[in-house]
């Protein structure tokens, strides 16, 4: 069972919890196009199939795809409460939120690192997650600002690294593993 393997890891970070979330799993890759979003969705659906309450956050601001993968109609927007909090979309039993849900269609994000990290943190903290056992975060590719901000400010339970067998992808995957180790986030597994 997937849930049993993940549950054995507990974050030891002294960071504030994300309201309504017990465990946060980051799904990351060193480079794009390796199947990270597909893995994130499949992990979320597998945990849900085992009876867990699961959410998924699309933190890939520059190339969000979770909405499309879950069949959320293009242009559909989450409800907003108190002019501040997003109500996550529901799709296939998963609670979901994405920058794609709160920005205009086909508008490329041309933000720099601090703005992007701030937007991801805002999306994470201002979504009304409803008592999740697991929140799967589909990270953008690489080991940059978003990954470091998340590692330093969010109690991430563990990470799953996604790669392909090509030499470049494997090297980038190793960088991702090393980054998570340096910030004391256990790597739960590598998907190739």
Roles of regions detected by a PLM:
Residues 18, 63, 113, 117-121, ...:
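Amphipathic alpha-helical transducer elements in NTP-driven molecular machines
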Residues 126, 133-192:
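Conserved catalytic-core segment of NTP-binding enzymes
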Residues 1-28:
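Extreme N-terminal, non-catalytic leader segments
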Residues 33-42, 64-67, 139-147, 169-172:
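Short glycine/serine/threonine-rich phosphate/pyrophosphate-binding segments
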Residues 21, 32, 58, 66, ...:
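Residue-level signature of catalytic and energy-coupling elements of molecular machines
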Residues 23-60, 177:
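Walker A/P-loop phosphate-binding motif and the immediately C-terminal alpha-helix
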Residues 47, 53-106, 111, 117, ...:
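Phosphate-binding loop that captures ATP/GTP phosphates
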Residues 100-150:
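Phosphate-binding/switch loop-helix module in NTP-utilizing enzymes
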